[in-house]
Amino acid sequence: NYPSWKSLKYNIPLITRMGLSGQPNEGADIGGFAGPAPTEELFVRWVQQGIFQARFSIHSASNDNTVTEPWMFRGSADLIRDAILLRYRFTPYLYSAEYNASKTGAPIMRALVYDFQDDPNVYEESFEFLFGRDILVANVIEEGAKTRKVYLPAGCKWYDWSDKMRCYEGGQTIEIPVTMASIPMFIREGAVIAMADNQLMTMEGDHTTDLHLIVAPKGTVTTTLYDDDGVTNDFKSGVFRKTTITTTAGERVTMDFTSEGSYED
C-alpha cells in the first residue's frame, strides 16, 4: 500500500473483491503505509475514500522520517476533519451494516455487481462501490480532477447527495463537477439512511440522542437498524435494539417503527 494515486484507485477493487470473496471487513492504510509522505491532495482524497471502509486507520511506516497524520496538512485540515466527522455521522448506518455482515456476509463496501447483477454495465465498473446497500460512492481518484464520471446502475433512481438530492434515472453515466471538498454520493431509491447528529465526535463515551433519517421513498420498503453497547457480549442475552422501519410512499410518506430487544441507551 504505497502513497500513490494508483494505490488509492486500486484499493477500491481490492476491497470490493475481497468482499465478494467472503471478507466483509476490510480497509487500506489511509495515505499509504510504506514510502514517502503523501501529497496534500492525495491524502485528502484518501481520507475521503477511507471513511467508507470498515477499517479506517491512518498510520504509516514512511521511509522519509515522516509520520502520516491528519494534522500534517494544515491547509486542508478542515476537509480532513469534515470527512472524518461524516464517518461518525454515518455510525448508525455503518453499525447496522456491520451487524448485517455478521449475519449474512454482505460486505460493507460492495462491488456494484453484488446488488445489480442484471445490469451488464456494472461488470465493467471497478472504481465505484456501494457503502452498505443504499449509498453509491464515486470518490475522486484522479490527481487534479475537476469532474467525475459516475455510472448509475439500472433498475432504480438515484439521488445526488451533494446537489440538493437531484434525482437521476439509473442506467446512465453522468459527469459531475468536483472540488477538493467533493465526496460524490448517490442515495438509492427506497433507502432510509440513519445518521447521528453533528455532536458525535468519538465512539468512546459519546452517545447520540437523535437520529436523522434521510428518506428516498419508493413503494413500501423495510429497513432495519441495529444497536447495542458495542463493548460487551450482552447482546447474546437480548441486550440489543433492532428497529424495523417500514416506509410507504404515496401522497404522503408514512413511516412505522417497531423494535425488539432490551437495549435502551
Listing of model-derived features with the role each one plays in the protein:
Residues 1-182, 187-188:
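Catalytic-domain carbohydrate-binding cleft regions of carbohydrate-active enzymes
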Residues 182-265:
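Accessory, solvent-exposed terminal regions and/or long lumenal/extracellular loops of proteins
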